[in-house]
Structures are given as structure tokens and as C-alpha cells.
Amino acid sequence: NYRVKMSSPSLSENSCSRLSPHFTYGSISIRQVYQKLNDSLPKLENKKDLYSFKKRLYWHCHFVQKLHTEPELEFNSMHRMCDSLRTEHNKEIIEKWIKGETGFPFLDACMKFLNKHGWINFRMRAMIMSFASYNMWQPWQKTSPLLAELFTDYEPGIHISQVQMQSGVTGINLPRIYSIPKQSMDQDPSGEWIKNLLPQLKNVEAKLIHSAELNDAYLPQIVDLKVSAKFARDKVWGIRKSKEFKEEARRVYLKHGSRRKRN
């Protein structure tokens, strides 16, 4: 059930391959895993999970190649016009975010888990970064290094590509603002995973945890989700409509787009 369970922060802990640290440090190569995977496919009746995993091996190499192609991406947005989107940063809210003290239980639980284990599944990584860039409206250049320090599987090419994608600064990917309440309900309906990581909520009903309407039962929220999401959408789409933006996006697509046809 790799395809189904990989989205859940609790289920993915045992259903994902957990090979990423080995790829990062070279103790196991992607080539070894790829060859072993191809050897195993003919022996299986249900091949969907392995095919899904195989795609992610391709993506690994694709994202790493982006940074090799353009090393400046460590500091500059893939779409250069996006560097003017977020120019100021707030150390106080960034610190609360990285420690898991934002006032949103599911997000904070994910950050507590990541701080403790050095790993969390892809969907939650995307949600964490999306919140920092859209709801907190912080420059990805300030939040990305702090997040990178937490990962035992930190791979610069993948990390920076995903950070920029979840921050809406690639120019070729649609902006995606994750709903914290929806992810909370979808990924941890009972709220038990959250309560294990945030024991102060052990006696709180799951529906209140998901809605984050906890009043004095939990930490104050550092942002208003609806207001901050609207602000971010207006800002991002405000520049995406211009002719100049589309021309620059075309350059990015030709250089980095994964669906570009090659002779």
C-alpha cells in the first residue's frame, strides 16, 4: 500500500522505502535500487506500488539535475521575477515555525516529528514549506536552510527544487496553498498521532484539534489562515498575469521543464 500510505505522516513511516538517507550519503546507490526493482517487477502480480516508487527514482534524478544545471538556484528563484515577492522576514515567527509552535496542531505535530526523527513524508514536507512561504509570507531563502538542517536525507537538488515549487517561485508550477485543517482531518482523522506528539491536547476532541479552534487550550496562532492565504494568492497571481512573467516562465520551462520533448 505504498501509494495509499505514503501521504500519511504516521503510516508512511513504515510504508515508504526510507532509503533517502542512503541515497544522500551513498551507502546505497539509486542504480542498485533501480536494478533490483526491475528484477522484482516480473515476479509480482500487483505492480502499481513499485511503478509508483520507480517514478520517484526518476524524479530524484530530475530534481538533482536542476541544481547541477543552474547552481544559482540555491539563492535565486527559478523565475527571477519572483525574488521581488517576499523581501522582508520575521525572525520571531520563523523560529516558532521551525520549533513547531505555530498554534496549528497538525502542522506543529509534523514539525515536532521532524525535529525528533530527521525525516517526514513528502506531502508533509510540502505542507510545511507551503505554510512558511504563503501563510507566513517569508522568503524561502530564509526558511529553506533551517528546514534543511533537520533532514537526515538532505539532498540539495531535491530540497531546493521542492522549496521553490512549494513557494510558487518556479514560474512553471501552479501555486498550491495547503489547507492545514483539511490535511489534519485527511491524514489523522482520530487525532491520535497529533496527541502523541502534542500531549497537552490528549483530552481535546479531534474535531477541535482539526479546526484549530482551541482558544486557551493551545498556543496562539501566528497567522490567520484565511486572510494570509488570500493575501498570498493575490500577490502571486498579481505578477503571474503579466506578459513579462510569461516570457520568463517560458525560459524556465525550456531549461528545467520535465515534459520537454528532446530529439
Language model features with spans:
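C-terminal catalytic domain of photolyase/cryptochrome flavoproteins
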Residues: 5-263
